Design a protein with these regions (language model features):
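Carbohydrate-binding surface patches
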Residues: 21-26
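Non-catalytic substrate-recognition/targeting regions of SAM-dependent transferases
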Residues: 3-16, 32-101
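Short, flexible turn/loop "capping" segments at secondary-structure junctions
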Residues: 18-20, 135
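Short intrinsically disordered, low-complexity coil segments enriched in acidic
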Residues: 1-3, 219
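Rossmann-like S-adenosyl-L-methionine
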Residues: 74-219
């Protein structure tokens, strides 16, 4: 994450860097209006080969802005190959979640791999960042995500790295955890990396219930 909105004094602008390529989100009118000014500055600052516009976040609707995504500058291959620790991951900067990959979790992925053992479970796995790192030490890993395209990416990334001890399931994580608990199945290592369950004040109560449920069932 090269630019993190308010945290870097640039509210409404998020820029992630994957190797030679950038993904950018312009989330408020002030940044949207300055997009044509910002793009050449990003090119100059990061010496990148291409910039993908990922301004398709739902928060833009609250600002009266349409959702947009597509190439902003240069060229961006699909997928882009990134490296985390000793593993390679293919990610789509255009079609992946948010800016394509969750770079803020990169170090956590590697650390989880060091502590994994026995039978491991990765819930909300996305492209397998936690699952594939854990597979290097765990006996076997189950990766669960509700998105079939994401699960296809996990399988492809496992094959890319020669990893064969990962089972990938495209199913609802809540339903999966309930079924595992009911069946009495247990895991030695469990990772929960859920999306935001509460994106507005009205959703806070339901979001807290969701977080409580997955944590209780994981334990």
């Amino acid at each position: 994450r090269s630019i993190h909105a308010d945290g870097d004094g640039l509210p409404g602008l998020v820029v992630a860097r994957d190797g030679d390529y950038l993904s950018a989100q312009f989330l408020i009118p002030a940044m949207e209006q300055r997009r044509d000014l910002l793009v050449p500055l990003l090119v100059e600052q990061f010496a990148c080969k291409g910039i993908m516009n990922r301004s398709d976040a739902g928060v833009r609707a609250f600002e009266g802005l349409p959702q947009e995504k597509g190439l902003l500058w240069g060229s961006v291959p699909d997928p882009v190959v990134i490296r985390e620790g000793q593993l390679e991951f293919a990610v789509s900067l255009e079609h992946g979640q948010k800016t394509g990959s969750f770079l803020d979790q990169r170090e956590n992925h590697v650390v989880a791999g060091r502590y994994a053992r026995g039978l491991a479970l990765d819930c909300f796995s996305y492209i397998g960042g936690f699952a594939l790192q854990m597979a290097r030490r765990a006996e076997r890993v189950t990766a669960v995500d509700s998105s079939e395209p994401a699960c296809e990416q996990i399988r492809a990334n496992a094959a890319r790295n020669g990893i064969a001890n990962v089972d990938v399931l495209a199913t609802n994580v809540f339903d999966f955890l309930r079924a595992e608990v009911d069946a009495g199945r247990r895991y030695d290592t469990v990772v929960l990396d859920p999306p935001a369950f509460a994106k507005s004040k009205d959703a806070i109560a339901a979001g807290l219930r969701g977080y409580k449920e997955i944590n209780l069932r994981a334990m």
